[in-house]
């Protein structure tokens, strides 16, 4: 009951915040339209309680740490049974809190054990006009028609070893017509782009560092990519265990990478790199790990990576 109360309180808060945001913009991915948690909206509530600044509250069954995403009047999120055997998509009406869809998407025969710090529904969905893509890590990815809830396509082959006790957390993102997903497990590490209409693979690029030389718990990561400028175009800056990469978002070709000593990079507070002009700031993981900063190289791979290790203290 305590965990359900926390889930409800969090959901009510996010609804109230995004209710104002959505008047001028769609909150279509993890941490909003720009991926950095910022909004141009004003007049957002600064405090709330059970009786203050709450328009509605809707119970969400089971457990899930995914953030809601909003398009129009729809709010989508995911949830899963505590042991991960059943995975669900939830949609509610933004204005009333009324349940629109409660869809059982996947059954999982043998989910890996996780701790209470994670759930089997932690990755945040991504949404655009008419489609929502919901990702559960190795356990499945689905694209739904937002009006009917009909399943348009699924993928259950993006498999990796999420590590016993850890579980999935990397959220998908949309880059033009592709859904980009990180698959960074203990056994395999790659980034993949799927056609958002068909779900077919557009490109798939293995991580180029030699992960077999790293301790096994340094290979896992929980991140998502961000777009950064590169000349007149863009590059996809992609954090992983022990490294930070950049790829051509159209072809998946690796443009550059830098190696660092951070590991277990996680979306707390930022599951994607923070891009500031030509500079990238990336959290290197939990405990006393290094937090690399570097240049988001505009002209391709540099002769010498311009990296600055900014700190070694544990950060939230």
What are the language-model segments listed below?
Residues 1-11:
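Bacterial N-terminal signal peptides that target proteins for export
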Residues 9-20:
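Bacterial N-terminal signal peptides
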Residues 22-316:
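Noncatalytic, solvent-exposed loop/strand surfaces
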């Amino acid at each position: 009951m305590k965990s359900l109360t926390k889930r409800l309180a969090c959901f009510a808060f996010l609804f109230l915040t995004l209710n104002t945001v959505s008047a001028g913009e769609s909150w279509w991915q993890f941490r909003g339209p720009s991926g950095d948690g910022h909004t141009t909206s004003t007049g957002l509530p600064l405090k709330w309680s059970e009786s203050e600044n709450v328009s509605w509250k809707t119970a969400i069954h089971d457990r899930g740490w995914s953030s809601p995403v909003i398009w129009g009047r729809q709010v989508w999120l995911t949830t899963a049974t505590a042991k991960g055997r059943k995975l669900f998509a939830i949609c509610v009406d933004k204005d009333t809190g009324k349940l629109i869809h409660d869809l059982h998407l996947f059954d999982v025969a043998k989910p890996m054990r996780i701790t209470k710090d994670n759930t089997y529904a932690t990755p945040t969905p991504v949404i655009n006009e008419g489609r929502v893509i919901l990702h559960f890590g190795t356990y499945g990815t689905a694209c739904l028609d937002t009006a009917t809830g009909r399943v348009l396509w699924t993928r259950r082959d993006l498999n990796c070893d999420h590590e016993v006790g850890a579980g999935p957390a990397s959220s998908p993102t949309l880059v033009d017509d592709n859904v980009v997903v990180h698959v960074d497990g203990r056994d395999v590490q790659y980034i993949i782009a799927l056609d958002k209409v068909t779900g077919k693979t557009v490109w798939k690029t293995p991580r180029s560092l030699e992960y077999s030389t790293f301790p096994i718990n340094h290979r896992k990561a929980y991140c998502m990519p961000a777009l950064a400028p590169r000349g007149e175009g863009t590059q996809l800056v992609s954090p992983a265990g022990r490294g930070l990469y950049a790829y051509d978002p159209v072809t998946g070709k690796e443009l550059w990478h830098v190696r660092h000593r951070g590991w277990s990079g996680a979306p707390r507070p930022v599951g994607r790199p923070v891009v500031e002009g030509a500079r990238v700031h990336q959290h290197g993981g939990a405990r006393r790990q290094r937090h690399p900063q570097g240049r988001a190289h505009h002209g391709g791979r540099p002769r010498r990576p311009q990296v600055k290790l900014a700190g070694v203290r544990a950060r939230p």
